[in-house]
Amino acid sequence: MNKIHLCTLAVLTSLSFSSLAKDCDANLLPSWKDSGSKTAIVNFVEQSTDSSKATFIPVSDRIAVFDNDGTLWSEKPIYFQIAFALDQVKALAKMHPEWKTQEPFKSVIENDLEKVFAGGKESLLQIMKVTHSGMTVEEYQQSVEQWLAAAKDKRFGKAYNDLTFKPMREMLTYLQENNFKTYIVSGGGVDFMRVWAPEAYNIPEEQIIGSALKYEYSFNDGQPKVMKLGELLTLDDKEVKVENIQYIIGKKPVLAVGNSDGDQAMMQWATSQPNSMAMIVHHTDEAREWKYDRQSDVGRLDKALDEANARDNWQLIDMKNDWCAVY
């Protein structure tokens, strides 16, 4: 390489690093560019924690709720818990020879996902029931652990629990360091998330709220156990998120973060008071992750997108332009 090329490379490298330094502060939310989203987060936290300001929020009221799928980790091309369920059907197929001719299991075994999803919610519910019930909570969570240790996302070649968003992990840490109590309020299965989310997000099991099948307690031969049944207890989506927040947390959050219309209700609930904020992760980066919103079957963002554009205390996070890194 001649001197001219070396000089050119040095200049370009210098410009690249200087641009990175300008855009990404290594000391505060380092995976966030210096954009409106980062400013909104920092301003909200600083105003909430400064006791000399009217915007001060007592520690006991610093409640922040986060969706999980599409907000804290990816959700494409299918929800990761669905990927787990499909793999479990294949693993259990040896014990169920009747599935070879019985839908939707036949299509799962044959990897015909188009036909599986053509069956709609009823097909998915059948799949979820046979893979998520008829066992103790401990047995179920062990199966999730084993799956996470072996399964890989086909596009990125990573373990599914390595596909959490680095900027969002930093945001959670920043809030936690400023005495915000962070909760997950997700449509995902609560027992599924409690296996891996505490380590990923530093959020304890008791602060994870999600969908659940009914449980049954029994005490036989001196042994207590809790079984997972094949009947829905709660589907933690849309307005049910607000109802579960009230039932379980008992306080209105001051910050709600989501990515889809399924999160709109809890964002409305959180921002129906002064000194509050909602944030929406907008998937705009098809190169590093996925690009989707209004027309997506998974994580559709339509009505909430319109509301975000009309509300002063709702902030859109533009994944492509606001994040220095995704994973």
Question: For each of these PLM feature ranges, what is it?
Answer:
Residues V59-P77, M267:
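Asp-based phosphoryl-transfer active-site loop
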Residues A21-W32, G36-V42, E46, D61, ...:
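C-terminal cap/substrate-recognition subdomain and adjoining C-terminal extension
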Residues M1-C7:
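Bacterial N-terminal signal peptides that target proteins for export
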Residues A54-P58:
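Short loop/turn motifs at secondary-structure junctions and domain boundaries
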Residues I78, A83-D162, K166:
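A metal-dependent, Asp-based hydrolase signature
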Residues E75-I78, A83-L86, V195-W196, W269:
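Short, solvent-exposed loop/turn and secondary-structure capping segments
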Residues S16-S18:
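N-terminal signal peptide c-region/cleavage motif recognized by signal peptidases
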Residues T8-T13:
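Hydrophobic helical h-region of N-terminal Sec-dependent signal peptides
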